[in-house]
Amino acid sequence: MKKHLNFYITLWIVKLISAGLKLLGKNATYYPGKLALDMCPGFMGMLDKPKTIIGVTGTNGKTTVSNMINDILIDNGYKIINNKYGSNIDAGIATTLLQGATLFGKSKKEIAVLEIDERSAPKVFPYITPTYLICTNIFRDSLMRNAHTEFISEIVSKNVPKDTIVIENADDLICSGIAPNNAKIYFSI
């Protein structure tokens, strides 16, 4: 997406607010991204992304898996951006990308490891194409929120970008069936 003046104004305001929140001892994992998306709806699409993006989604284990991947990559010398505090909806992901960007929206990191809430796929994947998307599992979670496992798998399947390589839990039949037309790698426990 082409960057315009509103993008830069938004970027500078939310970077300033994010720095202020951190000075006050806050993690600033949600609000800066929420404000950025309110001020500039295409904000996530305009930010430059790291060359490699690893997304982690599923009902359980997203934070653990994304933090393990993050730690392994850091231990091997990579420059990483990660939403390690679990702010995994669109605003949290926008905040994470913002924190890894310069004042001109260029990425300062080589790799992004992003925990992505499965219900946020329609709001995230139009702007971010993960190189890899790991699906840990898909279980019936909160009935009020997720209704049924097939409902969740359909949301993820319909929104995974076609160029994303999907890494799926082969022990979970529902998880191993998402994004049927994408390249796949399977793992088992």
Language-model features: locations:
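Short, basic phosphate-binding NTP loop
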Residues: 1-55, 75-76, 91-101
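Acidic, Mg2+-coordinating active-site environments of NTP-dependent enzymes
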Residues: 51, 108, 139-189
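A conserved segment at the C-terminal end of the G1
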Residues: 52, 56, 64-84
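Conserved glycine(s) of the Walker
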Residues: 61
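General beta-strand structural signal in soluble alpha/beta enzymes
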Residues: 80-84, 114, 167-169, 186-187
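Short acidic loop-to-helix transition motifs that present clustered carboxylates
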Residues: 87-92, 116-121, 151, 173-174
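Loop/turn-to-beta-strand initiation segments
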Residues: 105-112
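Extended acidic/charged loop-beta regions that coordinate divalent cations
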Residues: 112-141, 178-189
